[in-house]
């Protein structure tokens, strides 16, 4: 009977969910019972699903937060804007300011250079917003 109780406890722990942002490299991809599309996908997953996703070379975990953490924090930025802004700022900081392919004559980062270094397309408005957020 105690073995059954232990198995039940294991099943209960596998049902603990977290919210994860998963980046998919393919147009459509299915793993761990979840359908993903190219780009970032915000999904609710169990710890078992998260382990399967972490082991997959087509998917990468951008972030993962337990349900308790989200409740304490007051929610999740479902659009991932804060995370994207942080990544844009880090990318711009890593560009060569002396390289005319990276920056305009006025000192603005070029969209093409930021998108290439970031590994995903971003707009001029997104870059400006990310940099303005850092100045605020």
From Swiss-Prot:
Pfam families xref list: FluMu_N
Induction: Expressed in the late phase of the viral replicative cycle. Expression of late genes is activated by the viral late transcription activator C.
Location relative to the cell: Host cytoplasm
Keywords recorded for this protein, A-Z: Host cytoplasm, Late protein
Regions crossing the membrane: none
InterPro entries: FluMu_N
Presence of the UniProt keyword Zinc in the record: no
Gene Ontology CC terms, in alphabetical order: host cell cytoplasm
Gene3D superfamilies: 3.40.5.80
Superkingdom of the organism of origin: Viruses
Protein name: Uncharacterized protein gp35
Organism: Escherichia phage Mu (Bacteriophage Mu)
């Amino acid at each position: 009977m105690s073995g059954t109780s232990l198995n039940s406890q294991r099943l209960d722990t596998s049902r603990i969910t977290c919210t994860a942002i998963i980046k998919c490299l393919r147009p459509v991809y299915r793993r761990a019972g979840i359908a993903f599309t190219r780009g970032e996908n915000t999904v609710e997953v169990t710890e078992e699903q998260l382990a399967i996703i972490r082991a997959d070379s087509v998917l990468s975990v951008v972030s993962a937060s337990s349900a308790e953490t989200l409740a304490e924090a007051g929610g999740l930025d479902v659009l991932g804007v804060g995370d994207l802004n942080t990544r844009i700022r880090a990318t711009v900081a890593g560009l060569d300011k002396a390289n005319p392919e990276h920056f305009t004559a006025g000192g603005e980062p070029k969209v093409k250079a930021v998108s290439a270094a970031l590994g995903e397309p971003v707009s001029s408005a997104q870059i400006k917003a990310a940099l303005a957020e850092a100045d605020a």
